[in-house]
Amino acid sequence: DNGWAFTFSGALNTGDGYIRGTNYEGWTYFGNISKKINDSHKLSLTAFGAPQWHNQRATKHYIEDYKNSPDGGRYSNGYGCLNGALTGAGYGYNYYHKPQVSLNHYWTINANSSLTTSAYASLARGGGRRVAGNKTNWLTIDYNTGRPQAGAMLTPDGLFDYDAVLKANAESEHGSQVAFTNVVNSHDWYGLLSS
């Protein structure tokens, strides 16, 4: 009405994943507000993005690990429970969000000519979990074998024992011996296009 148009949508996708310990959450959103100023000029503001996080399985395992596991091909040992939630260990978690926003101007100069101009921005933030400290072996999988590092703190069923790690960190005379960190990938893109 009065030359205005509005469109908005969004969705949430969440689940446990096919592989054990690979739970995930992903949102998507889209929004557009457009205005027809007159027969020669239109403006359109658009924003969209898809923030997500996911746990992931270690990249390598021996075939016998799959065969010997009751989970078969769904087998994973690179996670544990932290505060009641499945939590991937070092190299077992990623997150990312790269929203994009653009303001477009459409100008019909005459019957034979037009000019479209777009100003845009994209502000990306994301990263992946790592472990740091003197005892990283408590919470890491050996990249070559897919098995926990020697000295890893595990529950009786072979998952990472975060409670034991928290207890050992709290009791250490030298502060925390291992901690989760994130390797971050961020960038800001801006631009102006006209054709």
Locate predicted features.
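Transmembrane beta-barrel wall of Gram-negative outer-membrane proteins
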Residues: 1-14, 19-57, 101-110
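Membrane-embedded beta-barrel scaffold of Gram-negative outer-membrane proteins
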Residues: 114-120
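Acidic/polar loop-and-plug regions of large Gram-negative outer-membrane beta-barrel proteins
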Residues: 34, 42-106, 118, 129-194
